[in-house]
């Protein structure tokens, strides 16, 4: 059985910023936690329940991933979760002073910086690295995801945006390690199409969105602070989101994930199927 030592942070770290959808300023605190705690969210502005970062606590997947427990809700967890998962952080208490995690620059960069600032501590207890007993898949309209047994965590993603000539079709495949995530995926920012901005605003979303935390694609070009960080930054960001969403399985696992046009809802659906076939 493949296993490794559990890991947590060496010290508490904080970051303050704005939430992209609700536009509220919030302070995020990451605290070390004991073995077998898992990743747990707490609303520091409420006396509500703790929210384990697990699939049964997924509350909403519209444009971001939201968790809940009782009356406590915490939104847009995926970029932080991707950073924690890719850094092999098993145990941490995440406190947030508002209902949404600060967005930073729209990527996982700020969360990787927080982890670096905190340092990583190896713990005594071990955690098994789970494997898939069989392939699983999820399909809905133009979205397809599959997970195959594999000796490493690999993600192959195809993004197809025929409605956006500036995005078009993009494909990337990575073996996910702390190094590959840090260099190839973590810097990649969230994005939106110019012609969907009004729709999102009408739904009460992206109230904190700006060019400091997102990239906007028009039919004839890109609106961004500076150049794209990669020519295929959108598909890399989709991989980032997928890592964050699948981390809610709650156990480290290895598999080859193949995705075509997936989003938060379908990512979570695949995560539930993966959970059913994990061993040990």
Swiss-Prot record:
Chemical reaction(s) catalysed: a UDP-3-O-[(3R)-3-hydroxyacyl]-N-acetyl-alpha-D-glucosamine + H2O = a UDP-3-O-[(3R)-3-hydroxyacyl]-alpha-D-glucosamine + acetate
Domain of life the protein comes from: Bacteria
Gene Ontology molecular functions: metal ion binding; UDP-3-O-acyl-N-acetylglucosamine deacetylase activity
Reported cofactor(s): Zn(2+)
InterPro entries the UniProt entry points to: Ribosomal_Su5_D2-typ_SF, UDP-acyl_GlcNac_deAcase, UDP-acyl_GlcNac_deAcase_C, UDP-acyl_N-AcGlcN_deAcase_N
Positions bound to Zn(2+): 79, 237, 241
Record: active site: 264 (proton donor)
Keywords tagged on the record: Hydrolase, Lipid A biosynthesis, Lipid biosynthesis, Lipid metabolism, Metal-binding, Zinc
GO terms for cellular component: membrane
Pathway the protein contributes to: Glycolipid biosynthesis; lipid IV(A) biosynthesis; lipid IV(A) from (3R)-3-hydroxytetradecanoyl-[acyl-carrier-protein] and UDP-N-acetyl-alpha-D-glucosamine: step 2/6
UniProt signal peptide: none
EC number: 3.5.1.108
GO biological processes: lipid A biosynthetic process
Pfam family, one: LpxC
NCBIfam families: lpxC
Family statement: Belongs to the LpxC family.
Role summary: Catalyzes the hydrolysis of UDP-3-O-myristoyl-N-acetylglucosamine to form UDP-3-O-myristoylglucosamine and acetate, the committed step in lipid A biosynthesis.
Name listed for the protein in its UniProt record: UDP-3-O-acyl-N-acetylglucosamine deacetylase
Organism of origin: Chlamydia caviae (strain ATCC VR-813 / DSM 19441 / 03DC25 / GPIC)
Gene designation: lpxC
